[in-house]
Amino acid sequence: VRRSRLMAAVIGTTALVLAGCGGGGDDSAVVEETSAAPEAAAGSRAVLRDAEGAEVGSVSFSEVAAGTEVVAEVQGLEPGFYGLHVHATGLCEPDSAAPGDPGTTGAFLSAGGHLGSEDAEHPDHRGDLPGLLVTEEGTGFLTTVTDRFGVQDLVADDDGSAVMVHSGPDNHANVPERYAPDGPDEATLGTGDAGSRLACGVVE
């Protein structure tokens, strides 16, 4: 009798376990239906090319809690510091005229000036960014966060925007009075003496 009762208990327990497993499948389905993957932060990207059309890197923009994260990667450049800015027009034409000055032509001049240059002097343009350091191996990597513009500011206006790597370092208009008693001149306040335009990418 005891053995029969034990077998009955085992069979009953097994039935309950199997019933529980069958119900578990439904629960999993409910979890799958109600769980949603978090949406990716809005972002944009620019592929950097030199005047010959060769790709030299990229710059990505994404929204983060503190503002806009900017991540720049370059390769194949000479070691040293390079000026890095967002320009006001989304055109990267290798031989073009500057907006409003058709008599002046050069590499990527169609990208216009720095984003926000009409509202402030360098280094307080909205498009001004920290300098990009390229190592002895010819590669450079920069991550920074700015609250001067959002991703939509770069792509939502009619003429877009572009990222520019300049041929030299940006002094951010930091010219001590012992060198220039009158302070930085107009050219320095415009570009930080970063030199010509080396590579450009339209923000998309």
Give each language-model segment a name.
Residues 2-5, 11-14, 22-81, 86-204:
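N-terminal leader/targeting pre-sequences
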